[in-house]
Amino acid sequence: MDSQLVLSLKLNPSFTPLSPLFPFTPCSSFSPSLRFSSCYSRRLYSPVTVYAAKKLSHKISSEFDDRINGALSPDADSRFLDRQKALEAAMNDINSSFGKGSVTRLGSAGGALVETFSSGILTLDLALGGGLPKGRVVEIYGPESSGKTTLALHAIAEVQKLGGNAMLVDAEHAFDPAYSKALGVDVENLIVCQPDNGEMALETADRMCRSGAVDLICVDSVSALTPRAEIEGEIGMQQMGLQARLMSQALRKMSGNASKAGCTLIFLNQIRYKIGVYYGNPEVTSGGIALKFFASVRLEIRSAGKIKSSKGDEDIGLRARVRVQKSKVSRPYKQAEFEIMFGEGVSKLGCVLDCAEIMEVVVKKGSWYSYEDQRLGQGREKALQHLRENPALQDEIEKKVRLLMLDGEVHRSTPLMSSSSSSASHREEEEEDSLDDFQ
């Protein structure tokens, strides 16, 4: 009964039959149907085997065509319904055990964009894709006198302007109410905690976060969060990894609580140097590496130079450069520059002009700045002076810049489950209504 038969299977790679009747290699060209052709040869010892193979190939081909056309058999439809019922039962069981909303479908929960609020620095908002994210952990680190506290105080002032509550955990015991007031902080309503140790600082911040009544908590700084065991011990005692373990344990609790409450946690951090590093960057932030993982946004701030007075004999400020080293809510590795004037804070007018130039709202040709058909001045200082003398024009330019930011970067943010179940259309109306709050 030996006969040389030419048999080949042309098979779609997404559906491969697992059967001993098909010991053949598929052809290089695929087709939804199975058929005999002269691509490969195989010796078969029984015509019954050939008949069975042909019959099974037609059956598989018809089933595959049904799958492509979306036609499900009653048995398959029944299995699908049973799986959906089992899924709903499991979700209901989890919600009854751990509380409503513990597990849900993203679409039914009202998927929304990442909610942000202004950092108070327009160029930084542009680099962040709209601002600082709500309900997330943010780390700001850099060398001494680089503007870390100033940046945090501007964020606190913006939250208070929008009617929110802010808290400052002053672990360094160096809070300056006069300087904070000059930056726009409502010091009368600012919640301040000057803790005795790191455990007290983080526990206080966690309790305020869980209350749901605080919108922003700033810890200044991680390096000053001294564990209780280190305070009670003698100076010079070796306490290995106490602060790192403290931060790791606290962040495991606080990150989830902050997300549920919609409270942003800002941690200011200092830079240390690793010993024995000859190649690469020896700089490292204090408090272990847990904060690097839990932070949704990490900002590195450094001084880019001093600002001299008009006579050139006195330093009146510094130019800060911020680099977005990590961001889970926008594109990372962007940079922002702004001027920090001593005793006054960030130059908001300079930020408006810089952003307007970047987004081509204001056009610079040569040394001249112009807005639409109106010339603002020759040189940066003249343009700033013109905007300073025309507040209405300044507000108009800033409003256009923020509208472009809302239409661009913010709408490309990562979706998540919002704590408030507002629809996308309602959010767009709120964004338009809240433009005046940015002023």
From Swiss-Prot:
Keywords associated with the record: ATP-binding, Chloroplast, DNA damage, DNA recombination, DNA-binding, Nucleotide-binding, Plastid, Transit peptide
Gene Ontology MF: a single term: single-stranded DNA binding
Source species, domain of life: Eukaryota
Signal peptide: none
Ligand binding (ATP): 142-149
Acidic residues bias (residue ranges): 429-439
SUPFAM superfamilies reported for this sequence: P-loop containing nucleoside triphosphate hydrolases, RecA protein, C-terminal domain
Family: Belongs to the RecA family.
Protein purpose: Involved in recombination ability and DNA strand transfer activity.
Identification of the protein by name: DNA repair protein recA homolog 1, chloroplastic
The organism of origin for this protein: Arabidopsis thaliana (Mouse-ear cress)
